[in-house]
Amino acid sequence: MSKLSRLSFMMFLEFFIWGAWLPLIFGYLPSLGFSPSEQAWILNAFPIAAIVGMFFSNQFADRNFSAEKFLAVSHIIGGAAILGCGFVDTFWPFFVLMLVHCLLYVPTISITNSIAFSHIDDPKKNFPIIRTGGTLGWITAAIPFTFILVDWESVNAADTNGFIAWLGTVLDSGLTGDAMKDATRWTYVAAGVASFVLAAFSLFLPHTPPNKVEIGTNRSQAWLESAKLLRHPFIAVLFIVTFADSFVHNCYFNWTGRFLGASVEDGGVGIASNWIMPVMTVGQVAEILTMLVLGVVLKKLGWRWTMVIGVMGHAARFAAYAFFPEYQSLIILIQVLHGVCYAFFFATVYIFVDAYFPKDARSSAQGLFNLMILGLGALAANSICPFLFDKVYTNNGVIDFQGLFTVPLVCASVAAISLALFFKPPEVSVESAIDDDTV
């Protein structure tokens, strides 16, 4: 296996793990009887780990261990933890196992990037290919559950004639109730097994030694210098909008699965439970295609309008959720906007930071925006979304999906308008753009 193939397969497994359990956890936790506050604690294990990672664990791992060995150990322990989540149904064991998994998994996201960048000669050419392996891993994680989450008793009772008729029945016979809850446990088993496979495979990755800190290097000073850059209005605006967009992005994950699976009579889309994960992966397929045209779009539209389109993609999707849930084909098709939202905003933010921040502050600046994207924005959404769903927009068991989706719709619209009106970066894309105090 070539080096590029090994690095791509590393990314495939890395994101298969995350993609296996994330889409269905938001409906699984309520099915276990967890309260909104308990759901919030479990869901916030990931952003808490992201925040800890940005300030401590990522740097600790990067400086003290060879990357491939850290990856192996993290996925052995983290894999056991996520595997255990499939066999517990009380709050404290589930929360502790999820927290252990996330504390070990989150640093591996940056570690896999470090391994990849350390062993490719042309990052601009090769890294997108390697990273696409991660997107394919996320998509692939959904495929087995199209069949695992099938109500096979109903399929057998249907007594269909011919393979095509049988397959149609299979694909339209999703599990419900306790049967769905029990089958969802397999998402954690799949994530755990993939973790063990990646742990073993890590030993065959190219050796990546720890990064030694040069004498006189002050990491906290670099963070402080990056934070000082928020005094520039265009960076402050982008920072705030990034928080809002991350909040909206995580509303999508919190609510979409349950919305897709709810019956039409209850205001949902009525998609069979075994199709929820595949439908949500439409966005990942679109992400691959959107990333291919991102460079062209940036040249044509520039930073501001590319990002505005990315944020407005959320608004358009949630508008469809709120006002056209009865159009199942539209709801499925509009999942492509997930890829547009990711590429045109999050990916563009990373590129923007690389273009505008001074070289000695870029790494910390990326971390600063990651704090919003993976940390604080997700933390806010995971804290608020379960409460809004269960306590504010559910009355006597009836969910007001229109009111629920109006929240991220308004939030995304305000963020996009703010970006359009107040985000005015300098015309130049070099370090002097923010070194100059007159900016």
Model-assigned labels for residue ranges:
Residues 1, 176, 205-241, 265-268, ...:
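Juxtamembrane intracellular "pre-TM" segments in multi-pass secondary transporters
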Residues 52-66, 149-150, 289-303, 389-390:
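Helix-to-loop junctions at the C-terminal end of transmembrane segments
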Residues 1-47, 234-242, 246-266, 275-279, ...:
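Helix-loop boundary and gating motifs at the non-cytosolic
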Residues 150-193, 387-412:
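A membrane-interface helix-boundary motif in multi-pass transporters
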Residues 157-168, 203-224, 428-436:
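Flexible cytoplasmic inter-helical loops of multi-pass small-molecule transporters
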Residues 85-86, 194-206, 404-439:
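Multi-pass alpha-helical transporter architecture, strongest
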Residues 69-84, 305-320:
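Structural signature of the two symmetry-related core transmembrane helices
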Residues 12, 81-85, 91-111, 115, ...:
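Hydrophobic core of transmembrane alpha-helices in multi-pass small-molecule transporters
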